[in-house]
Amino acid sequence: MSRRCLVTGGGSGIGAGITRVLAGAGDRVAILGRRRAPLLATLAALPGRGRDCMALAADVTRKKSLAKAVATVGERFGGLDVVVANAGIGGPNGCALPGPDRWDEIVRTNLDGTFFTILAALPHLQDGGRIVVVSSVLGRFGVPGYTAYCASKHGLIGLVKALALELAPRGITVNAVCPGWVDTDMAKAGMELLAKGTKVSFRKARSRALAAVPIGRMLRPDEIGASVEWLCSPAAGGMTGQAISHCGGAVMW
């Protein structure tokens, strides 16, 4: 049976991978993002050019416009069965660099934006539905210089655990996927910053990063999509409040 799905940050990277997997399973998918062009490109690459899917430009940090976009999806689809809160940003932010504005931007997007997305979707989400939050392995441990990012991703796991209890009476499950290094533009930008900060080549920085990954490679966005799709399946109906590390073995707890 086709599911009605909402995916934020669906225009690139992990979000695009999630969209491909869900659409490939026969689901109707609505993708949201700040820029319309990447969203349309993602849909155009789907089987049938995403004829049963839709794209809407929306910023998860802007509650009113986000709620309007989600309501449009809910009305068009006649409700929602799946909400995937994937939109997020990365980059460095330590105690002193680059300052409180960057902290606010990262936490506002990653943590607040996820909460705003779920709040906007709940009136349209059917009982027995699924919520999947994309956190990170940096939600499981800390990294110096990435204070805001780590804090926001840790916060998402706490949000998942609390919401899982709040929404259990409706039969709605809430889980998180915590990716490690995934082959995306965001990950490449992170490795470039790592190379610059350690004064080594990009190739060397990439090699050092992947040395901490037992399988020795970056994951593909569609692999993360497969984890999300499973959490939305009947087989995962008994799982809620969990954070699954999908990271090639970099984290084993």
Feature-to-residue mapping (PLM):
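Conserved glycine-rich cofactor-binding loop
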Residues: G11-G13
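Active-site helix of classical SDR
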Residues: I118, S152, V160
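Residue(s) in the substrate-gating loop at a strand-loop-helix junction
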Residues: S136
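Short, small/polar-rich loop/turn modules that mediate ligand/substrate recognition or access, typified
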Residues: V84, A168, T173, M239-G241
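Alpha-helical segment proximal to the catalytic Tyr-Lys
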Residues: P123, L165-E166
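Substrate-binding pocket helix/loop in short-chain dehydrogenase/reductase
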Residues: G94-V107, A209
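Short C-terminal tail/terminal secondary-structure segment
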Residues: F141, R217, V228-E229, T240-W253
